[in-house]
Amino acid sequence: MKRTVAIVLVVTLALVALLASCSGNTATEAAGEAIGVSRAVQNWSLWEPMNSFNSGVWNKADWTNGGMFNCGWKPDHAYFSNGQLVLKLDNVSSHGRPYTSGEYRTNNTFSYGTFEVNMKAARGSGTVTSFFTYTGSPWDEIDVEILGKDTRKVQFNYYVNGVGGHEKVIDLGFDAAAGFHKYSIEYGNGYINWYVDGQWKWGVNNNGMNAPKGAAMPSRPMQIMVNLWPGTGVDSWLGRFNYSGPLYAYYDYVKYTPK
């Protein structure tokens, strides 16, 4: 569906005035040096149909995370077609890895609120299609991951100071690689809720819901990130990756609403 090219940023009056005066890394484990010098911006509402690349809001990765991530991420593998962001995974070698794929992330970080994506996952054993939030060091992260070995399930996870191990796999009741669906993360002070197509699927909090009472929860502003990658050495988790041709993940829009 053709969509209007638009980015709406709703900010506080003080920030608007400032802008006007200046005008003229599940185990997704996204990434250390990829984060750079992003700024924490806590008052924006972000709505972006994925029609075209806006370097003022987003950047395309050009690096590799190494380890279990058996690809390099290159800018030309994150491109726009038919009103969607497309991440392509193929067997072009890059950054010392045998495969190349795409990773797309915001320049700024966002605090408590709801993060939403409308996406269609790639299908293929050994792969992960992701939507997640990430801080850099110290490492907090909240994940939505579709494992290509079974695209009728979704895996949720979170990290606090680099400690994960909170995976929860949920049956979707549909094939995430067959069409677009909405996945949302509600991130608050001491809690996280995950939704699919507007329906609550899983949640944790520090008051004893699916986590010990008093458990540490993510608390820092985070970048919004999406990527597609093949695994290596993690066959028991992802299944074995055997390349048989390019794979694609599609993203229709990303939305953030602050609390």
Please give the residue ranges for each predicted region:
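Bacterial N-terminal signal peptides
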Residues: 9-18
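GH16 jelly-roll
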Residues: 29-259
